[in-house]
Amino acid sequence: MVAWLVLLMVMIVGYDVMMRYLFHSGSVALQELEWHLFALIFLLGTPYTLKHDSHVRVDIFYKSQRVSDRQRAWIDLFGGLFLLVPFCLLIIISSIPFVTSSFIAGEGSPDPGGLPWRFLLKAVIPLGFSMLLLQGVADMLRCIFVLRQKKD
């Protein structure tokens, strides 16, 4: 799904640039849609990236042959438990009042010609971080499974 959002964003940006530079006609709504799509790509793509172990890390140490699977599991478990889980919980808990007030106000764009229903985009913040948290927990369970296996 996120790949389709990227394709859609590329097409919208291309159209917006063409309209602005060739026809001198810009659109606030299109520019806001680009920002909204980028936010969706980030918020929904991050859990997917974690699932497929594609996040940036210092591979010179982590992927070297000197680091065993058990050591990698310890590194991942530590990172998940002490970095990922607290960060996700902080974002989820602190974003709920932010999203709630946005829903109550029916928040839209403050710019003339901007997009309405900004509260819908803000609702994706706790959703995306909840998905990231769930994927992090799944990865930590996988690490525990690796650590519980008997050494060869």
Region annotations inferred by a language model:
Residues 1-152:
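Alpha-helical transmembrane segments and membrane-interface helix-loop junctions
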